[in-house]
């Protein structure tokens, strides 16, 4: 759907034979939550393109964020709902940078300033208190329901600054480091 949308609008890599739309794709593993929900297909890709607009985007339990969860140390029943988030900055020098992130990690989401857990594995399915995942793992607690699969955090960073391949690589590294920061 996305490729067709771009091709119909002649957006892509120009060749002597015509424009070749280049589309990257990524998904989160959310079958434990979203097993009966829609799976990405051409129709959904086209619909996403048609719904795109300038300005703030919907956040939370939308799009790829629908099946996202946080803190899966003791399985999905004790995980917290994840989702889609975004941020944007426009500087005085007309530099624009935006980030769109689908938060679906195994571990906790921690406030870097206070160290407080914002979302993660709960002490019980009904609890509002969080287990500190890293500490629990260090104590070698039994990993009830643990699976190494299904823990994907996706991030896209965009800017209006012209960057060469080396600069793009550096931006990608910084974005990745930002995800891993404790």
List PLM regions with ranges.
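Glycine-rich, N-terminal phosphate-binding loop and its surrounding beta-alpha-beta segment
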Residues: 1
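A structural signal for small-residue-enriched, beta-sheet-centric alpha/beta enzyme cores
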Residues: 4-182
């Amino acid at each position: 759907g996305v490729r067709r949308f771009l091709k119909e609008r002649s957006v892509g890599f120009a060749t002597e034979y015509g424009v070749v739309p280049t589309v990257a794709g990524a998904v989160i593993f959310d079958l434990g939550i979203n097993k009966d929900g829609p799976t990405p297909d051409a129709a959904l890709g086209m619909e996403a393109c048609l719904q795109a607009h300038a300005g703030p985007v919907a956040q939370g339990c939308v799009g790829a964020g629908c099946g996202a969860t946080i803190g899966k140390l003791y399985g999905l029943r004790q995980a917290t709902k994840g989702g889609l988030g975004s941020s944007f900055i426009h500087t005085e020098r007309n530099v624009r940078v935006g980030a769109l992130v689908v938060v679906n990690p195994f571990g906790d989401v921690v406030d870097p300033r206070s160290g407080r857990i914002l979302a993660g594995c709960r002490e019980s399915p009904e609890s509002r208190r969080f287990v500190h995942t890293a500490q629990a793992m260090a104590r070698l607690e039994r990993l009830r329901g643990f699976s190494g699969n299904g823990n994907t955090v996706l991030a896209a960073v965009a800017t209006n600054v012209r960057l060469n391949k080396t600069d793009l690589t550096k931006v990608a590294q910084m974005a990745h480091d930002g995800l891993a920061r404790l």
